[in-house]
Curated annotation (Swiss-Prot):
PANTHER family in the record: EUKARYOTIC TRANSLATION INITIATION FACTOR (PTHR23001), EUKARYOTIC TRANSLATION INITIATION FACTOR 2 SUBUNIT 2 (PTHR23001:SF3)
One Pfam family per UniProt: eIF-5_eIF-2B
Protein name per Swiss-Prot or TrEMBL: Translation initiation factor 2 subunit beta
Function: eIF-2 functions in the early steps of protein synthesis by forming a ternary complex with GTP and initiator tRNA.
Gene name for this UniProt entry: eif2b
NCBIfam families (UniProt xref): PRK03988.1
UniProt entry tagged with the keyword Cytoplasm: no
Classification via InterPro entries: IF2/IF5, TIF2_bsu_arc, Transl_init_fac_IF2/IF5_dom, Transl_init_fac_IF2/IF5_N, Transl_init_fac_IF2/IF5_Zn-bd
Gene Ontology molecular-function annotations: translation initiation factor activity
Lineage: Archaea, Thermoproteota, Thermoprotei, Thermoproteales, Thermoproteaceae
UniProt keyword terms in alphabetical order: Initiation factor, Protein biosynthesis
Length: 134
């Protein structure tokens, strides 16, 4: 009985697809410091991979860091010198507040505005969660 059960269990594991990893891993942010400027060259690519509006992300960074910024293509320039650790901490906060599903911890989410409220909908589990406004 035990060997038959083990054989059936092994067969079942072979038939079932392996557990899927996250559809997309969280991309790393690149930070370059210049005199009186902080440049994030892969900002547009990050926004695209996270399925977020690049202007929404830029507004979040500007408010959190309290500095103005300009967006030219994929490059986001902050007009103030900030350390890479501070920028990475703000990026991690953005991920936590506006990207990761609080129910299943998936990053496969979309953000949409319904009236005055931003709603984050998880594409993995289907949960809809209101998020704090900018």
């Amino acid at each position: 009985m035990d060997s038959e059960y083990a054989a059936l269990l092994e067969r079942a594991y072979k038939l079932v697809a392996p557990k899927a990893q996250r559809r997309a891993e969280i991309p790393k942010i690149e930070v370059e410091n210049m005199p009186r400027k902080t440049i994030i060259p892969n900002f547009g690519q990050i926004a695209k991979r996270l399925n977020r509006d690049v202007y929404f992300m830029a507004k979040f960074f500007q408010k959190e860091l309290a500095v103005p910024g300009t967006l030219e293509g994929d490059v986001f320039t902050l007009h103030g010198e900030k350390s890479p650790k501070v920028v990475e901490a703000v990026y991690d906060r953005f991920i936590r507040y506006y990207v990761v599903c609080p129910v299943c911890n998936s990053i496969d989410t979309e953000l949409r505005k319904e009236g005055r409220i931003f709603i984050m909908r998880c594409l993995a589990c289907g949960a809809s969660t209101p998020v704090r406004p900018l």
